[in-house]
Regions:
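Short, Lys/Arg-enriched C-terminal cap helix and immediately downstream tail that follows
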Residues: 204-220
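Short alpha-helical "packing" element that flanks the helix-turn-helix/winged-helix DNA-binding module
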Residues: 168-175
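Flexible coil/turn residues that form the inter-helical turn or adjacent wing/linker of helix-turn-helix
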Residues: 178
Length: 224
């Protein structure tokens, strides 16, 4: 069982014009750096390294679900203000896996991840515009209720995240990625601990993190 992650830049056409060529290059350089760091940090669970497959898309393959959402959060928080949509595909891989060439792997895990990216694009054109940025699909639908529950929960988490301000994101990045306490985050950012607490509460951070951790636990219990 494998866990494919496909990420896609939202509104990538807006950074594909000649006037924004420099911005596009900077985005690709930054994204490449983030993915390289992920490949090193999470090497134990990576079956095929994360890499950019198209100018506005990247993918990677995991052999264990433990860090699926931690990896996604790392990418999202580090690439902001560029926004991304993610498809998570759970399933088998038919081809031989080359760790350094994820683009050559093929199978239901990637098909499902791709389907979810496309599904998010469809939802963005309707009433769900902006409120969904991650969806999950499994190869054989043995857990339809759990999948629906997780996707609904991810939708709620996305709605919370979309309202975060720059200052709130700064703190959340310190807490989630750097694993700092509120006191440590306050020292890093040069603010008081009470300010950190207020911003986290205003951001709905505790509801968000509980939702993400619940989904991560369910995924690990079923497929871990």
């Amino acid at each position: 069982m494998y866990f494919a992650i496909i990420g896609d830049i939202i509104n990538s056409r807006n950074i594909n014009t000649d006037s924004t060529l420099q911005i596009r290059n900077e985005v690709q350089i930054n994204l490449s750096k983030i993915l390289e760091e992920i490949n090193i940090k999470y090497a134990d669970v990576i079956a095929a390294n994360f890499l950019i497959t198209l100018g506005d898309e990247f993918q990677g393959l995991l052999n264990h679900p433990k860090y699926v959402f931690e990896i996604i959060e790392t990418i999202k928080l580090n690439i902001y203000p560029i926004k991304l949509r993610f498809g998570i595909g759970i399933g088998s891989i038919y081809t031989k896996i080359n760790r350094d060439m994820a683009i050559g792997a093929d199978g239901p895990a990637y098909y499902n991840a791709r389907k979810m990216v496309e599904q998010i694009k469809v939802l963005e054109k309707g009433k769900m515009n902006g409120s969904v940025n991650i969806m999950i699909k499994e190869e054989v639908e043995l857990h339809p209720h759990e999948i629906n529950l997780m996707n609904s929960n991810l939708q709620l988490c996305s709605s919370i995240e979309n309202n975060w301000t720059w200052k709130q994101r700064e703190i959340i990045k310190e807490i989630m990625l750097e694993k700092k306490s509120q006191v440590e985050a306050a020292e890093t950012l040069g603010i008081s601990q009470s300010s950190v607490q207020r911003r986290l509460k205003a951001a709905g951070f505790y509801d968000y993190i509980q939702g993400v951790e619940t989904i991560s636990t369910i995924v690990s219990q079923i497929w871990g």
